[in-house]
Amino acid sequence: MYAPKGIDESIESFCKKADVFKSFQVKVPEIFFRNDDLCHLIIEDFSDNLYQLNITQENSDIFIKSALDQLIRIQNIDCDTEIFDHFDLEKSIANKDLFIDFFCRGYLNLSDSSIPFDTIDEGYNFILKRFYELPLCISHYDFETRNLIYLDSKETGVLDFQDAMIAPYALDLASIFKDLYMVWDKTQVDDWLDYYKKNTQNEEI
């Protein structure tokens, strides 16, 4: 693993959060070697069984429920503000700006005069109001199929967690249920949500 200096996804953040995750039995890679000067880590190889490339309709129930088991452990981690930042309004607005830049301008090729900024703001503000009313917990922040690996032990390995932060609990659920690469029908999602609710240990949720 290579993490250049000066970016948010730092070696320090990865290692610190890896230790915290492991203490709550989250399946993250072992770190065998660290060199801050070279910006390198040697970490455990979790294999090539990446969710993004291997999940199907046939195995999705096993894969997703295994991922939810790991998510529940992540959400049990203490919200230590010395380690985890808050998913605050500034970050939310930054995500809205990414939507405008990459989707509206980049993908749809819209000019600024054609982008419905007021409608986007109205919809985003409505979502954020509901979003920030939800209970807070530790969020992976990228809990999607490209960052999950199904291990030989029948557990889910978790990668790319250096940006984990304190956020409303639904953030990671939305990431896995509304994945960028897979589309699940409502019946499946409802079943997985029931599984999550039955197994979560967070009484607020």
Question: What residue spans do the PLM features occupy?
Answer:
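ATP-binding pocket architecture of kinase catalytic cores
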Residues: 1-89, 93-94, 98, 105-108
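Non-membrane alpha-helical structural segments and their capping/turn regions in soluble enzymes
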Residues: 11, 61-68, 117, 121, ...
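Hydrophobic alpha-helical packing residues
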Residues: 21, 74, 127, 192-196, ...
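Active-site acidic catalytic loop and adjacent metal/ATP-binding pocket
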Residues: 74, 125-173, 180-187
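An alpha-helical support segment within catalytic cores of ATP-dependent transferases
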Residues: 79-86, 90-91, 95-138, 200-204
